[in-house]
Amino acid sequence: MSSLSLYTVQAVLILDQQGERIYAKYYQPPHRSDEGHQLLFNSVKKQKEFEKQLYRKTHKQDSEILIFEDHLVLYKEYIDITIYLVASLEENEIVLQQGFSAIRGALDLILNSGMDKKNIQENYDMVLLAIDETIDNGVILETDSNTIASRVSKPPTNEPQMALDLDKGFLGAWGFAKSKFQERLQQGL
């Protein structure tokens, strides 16, 4: 058994139908000095080359998991995008699958009109938040897609929303004062 670590994910990628990057986030654990990982993922040119080769390998395949260039890759193809989760070969496939399913499920809930390139680009901020809620610096934090989607889509409820309608308040006070004044006048007569 290799070293145990919470840092399981090396990258999360979303590529379009030409293999071009829509979203890419590479993680590097702070305590590991893995030279191969650093050389592969430190330059944008090498990252894009890796993504192109990965897309060519996985495009129109019937599997959901494969070993590619000493990396374990989980992926899912949709209409015009493919989502990838990249990890080292030593990682637990079941944990990775749960994290990957959480990302996919949360994105399905957030992007209720469909998982396609246009919808992802229109809701890019929500996609980023969902991935960041699931994986932080390579550590899978949450595996429940409903929890992730609720954290991303709900506005914060810390402060109560108080809408002051000054016209209504002023008119209400004026009406109250007017009625009290009329009562006093009637009592005085």
Swiss-Prot record:
The keyword Protein transport applies. It is a peripheral membrane protein. InterPro entries: AP_mu_sigma_su (IPR022775), Coatomer_zeta (IPR039652), Longin-like_dom_sf (IPR011012). It is found in: Cytoplasm; Golgi apparatus membrane; Cytoplasmic vesicle, COPI-coated vesicle membrane. Gene3D superfamilies: 3.30.450.60. CDD domains: Zeta-COP (cd14829). Keywords: Cytoplasm, Cytoplasmic vesicle, ER-Golgi transport, Golgi apparatus, Membrane, Protein transport, Transport. It comes from the Eukaryota. Pfam families: Clat_adaptor_s. One of its GO terms (biological process) is retrograde vesicle-mediated transport, Golgi to endoplasmic reticulum. One of its GO terms (cellular component) is Golgi membrane. Coiled coil: none annotated. Oligomeric complex that consists of at least the alpha, beta, beta', gamma, delta, epsilon and zeta subunits. Belongs to the adaptor complexes small subunit family. PANTHER family: COATOMER SUBUNIT ZETA, ZETA-COAT PROTEIN. The coatomer is a cytosolic protein complex that binds to dilysine motifs and reversibly associates with Golgi non-clathrin-coated vesicles, which further mediate biosynthetic protein transport from the ER, via the Golgi up to the trans Golgi network. Coatomer complex is required for budding from Golgi membranes, and is essential for the retrograde Golgi-to-ER transport of dilysine-tagged proteins. The zeta subunit may be involved in regulating the coat assembly and, hence, the rate of biosynthetic protein transport due to its association-dissociation properties with the coatomer complex. This is Coatomer subunit zeta. It comes from Saccharomyces cerevisiae (strain ATCC 204508 / S288c) (Baker's yeast).
